[in-house]
Amino acid sequence: MPYPKQMVEPMRKELTQLGVEELRTPDEVDAAFDQAEDETMLLVINSVCGCAAGNARPAVAKAKDATDHHPDRYLTVFAGQDLEATERTREYLAGIPPSSPFFALFRDGQPVYVVERKHIEGRNADVIARDLVEAFEAYCGDEEPPADAPSRPDPSSSGEGLPSTFQSIT
C-alpha cells in the first residue's frame, strides 16, 4: 500500500523545486527512457527514509550548484508511493539490486554510474554530492568518458565514522 500523498508531497517538492521531473506512471518512465537514448540523465529513486531526507535529496541540490557539468535531464520516481512507476524504472536497472534512495546516471540509455542506499547511509550530503559531481564531470559532456571513469562511489569514502558492526538495510 502506498504512503499517503500528503505525507510525501513535501519530500517530492524538495526535488521538483530543483527542476527534477517526476515520473509517476510506467508510461512516463518508458517515454523518459526512450528519449534518453541520445542524452544523459540522472534518475533519483526518492524515498521517505531519513537518509533520503538528510543526505540524498540535499546531495542533488548541492551537486547541481557545484559544477557546470550536468546531465541533460534530472528525473525521479518515488518508491513507496508511485509503485508501478518505480517497478518499471527498476526494469531498466537489470542486474542492479533495488534500493531507495538511489541514483543512477545514464548515458545513451545505459546506466554508467550508480549510487545505492549503502553508498548513502552514513555519508553526508556533501560527500554524496562530490560523488555525483565526479560522475557528471566524467559522463556529462560531448567527449567520451575516460577509461577509468568511476561507476560507483569510492568505497573507501563510504560510511566514515560508522562502527564496524554497521549493516546497510538495502
From Swiss-Prot:
InterPro entries: BrxB/BrxA. Belongs to the bacilliredoxin family. Residues 140-170 are annotated as: Disordered. One of its GO terms (biological process) is cell redox homeostasis. Gene3D superfamilies: Glutaredoxin. It comes from the Bacteria. It holds the Pfam family Disulph_isomer. This is Bacilliredoxin SRU_1493.
